[in-house]
Amino acid sequence: FQAEDGIRDQPRSRGLGDVYKRQDLELYLKSSFFSDVALSPDGKHLAFQSKSDEFTEGLLVARTDDFLDPKKGLEKATVAKAALENSGDDVLRVKELFLCRFNWVSNSLILVEICGKNFDRLRGEIFTALGVFKLFNIETKEFKNFLYPLEPAPKKGSMTFADRYRPATFISKYDDESILMSVAENKRGFRYAHLRRVFFDKRGVKPNGTDLYVSKQPCQFKVGYKANSACNIPYIFILDKDKKPALTFSSDLDGVYAHYADDKTTKIDIDLEDYTPFAIKDDLLWMYGVSGIGAHNVSLLNLKTKKIQKAVPSDCHSVISAMNSLNEATPYAIDMECDGKKEIIYFDQEKRDAQILSQLAPSFPDKNISLGNWTDKNDKAIFSVSDSSVVSEFFMLDLTKGTLIPIGRTSNVPKDKLHKMVSKKFKTRDGETIYGFLTLPKGEVKRLIVYIHGGPYGIRDYDQYDFSEQYLASKGAAVLKVNYRGSGGYGKNFMEDAYKEWGGTLLNDIADATIAVQKELGIGRSQTCAFGASYGGYAALGMAYKHSDLYECVAGGMGVYDMKILRDGSDESIYTYQDDYEETAEKFWGDDQAQLVDFSPVFNADKMNSRILMWHGLQDPISPIVHLELMKEALDKNNVPYQAFTMSKLGHTFGEKEDIKAHLPVLKDFLFDEL
């Protein structure tokens, strides 16, 4: 990286101590051995999704009994491996492929979905479900291409791209010979969802099979010359208990609608844009309420009365996981946060699985809990717990033996090196309730560091592993994360009421939580710093003049510092090229010029009284480098000391491991006033 100082001296040279710092950081950056595990329908095999420093990305399948036998272990238990090359796909214009999901579809076959990672000039870094699937046979070891969405161009005649492109979406396992997929077929310029039974022994990579239902309502609509597609949403078809289509969905300019899977694809005229449907039982459609990245409640739509009713207590928010019994789509329990605390909400406490869960859960307090993946005999399942202090830990529940057997932890970091995020509840200055997390070091609290999440709208912090947080806590920092107003997972009003409040309500919420924790820990301004990236970088610099009485130092990465050029689009962020940029900008930031100046760090440099560090990627397309340049000019003009560095290859991200090992120790030293 390139270091730049405004007025301050150059950072001191680095010696042997820095080597140890990098070694400590290496521990927290080490990739997990596996990220997910699934039990085969007969329970005889475990499939691990792997992408670690030791193993190539792909699947590793082991015999269950041998794997759980301490005398044999993984090496002797392994029966099959499938590796995925991370190269891109030029035809689909994807720069990188990765394994995003997998499902056991028989005792010997695993369906693997391949997704794409790309960079779009208009949308930035995007992760895309491509409709690419591979089939892994653990007996023959064949890892073959199963579905590919784009047919080759015909040798004679012509065929439009729309006619050639037929993406498929996995809906459900059907039987030992086939699965159910939704295939979007083009007809007269529109796409229609086909619920199709696709057989494993089919030839080629076309999504050929037997149609069980064809929607008469297009799942794609046009606005001008552009088309919007709802064809590949995971819930495009919802099945009944017999795996027959019950509902399908469509969208238009006004909303998202359910349709009965009848002869006419009859529309249910209720806008479901704020919901994600996921199951149906009798006349009740089960749905998650969606705000940003988080589902914030569970609601039921009565298909007869057309009324929607919440199914969980009013103080519950932020769905963590749903628990389902074998072959049932409706959950018997939901793991949620209620008033900021983890809690399991039971819908049917008489069910066997609910009683099992109620016996297991108390042994894992304040953990994110999941129970599912039952075998066909309904006697074995996967039980998992996760949070910041264990990362993820998997167990096999064996009812015939009455045992809960550890499978493994996903993390390579020893538990004694991990720190627990404790949920917190705060009252704001205007009487609202907000939530957050406080992570304490194992020894003396040397600093309070407020780690501000990005977004800001729709994003939120969870009790989960974060290498930056764990690294800072290992050095003696108490780390505070605040889900200020505007964060996702707490409801649409909680998010949208914070629009046009970047430098107002949002910063006040963070400040109010900071004051509460300072009092709790007996810590003052001299030991308190704030940092973040993206919106968090903006907020950190905003704290230097809005709430400088609370923060001795602030560190902002990849931040937007001039809201006037953000608002009018002259910073040339990738988002300014979108057709609806003006509409979005008005909604998020408004047109009050005085407020835009008040909320912009570049126009308030003379009021900044905290130590300042900034870092930025020269390739950042979302918060262009002009924001850092303008901020430095403003600080220089007002003789305000600061430190800054840029990284030549970095975009709007912390980067790869080597990038993080370069800049995170610098950030740590600054926050601890050791730079």
Language model features: what each stretch is:
Residues 235-236, 343-442, 461, 467-470, ...:
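Non-catalytic accessory segments flanking enzyme active sites
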Residues 403, 478, 641-643:
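Conserved beta-strand segments of alpha/beta enzyme cores
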Residues 247, 332, 422-424, 450, ...:
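Hydrophobic/aromatic beta-strand patches that form the interior of the parallel beta-sheet core
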Residues 18-380, 388-390:
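Beta-propeller folds
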Residues 1-20:
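Single conserved hydrophobic/aromatic residue that forms the stacking wall/gate
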Residues 484-675:
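Active-site-proximal cap/loop segments of hydrolase catalytic domains
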Residues 275, 294-296, 318-320, 339-342, ...:
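Flexible loop/turn segments at secondary-structure boundaries
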Residues 413-520, 524-526, 533-534:
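Cap/lid segment of the alpha/beta-hydrolase catalytic domain
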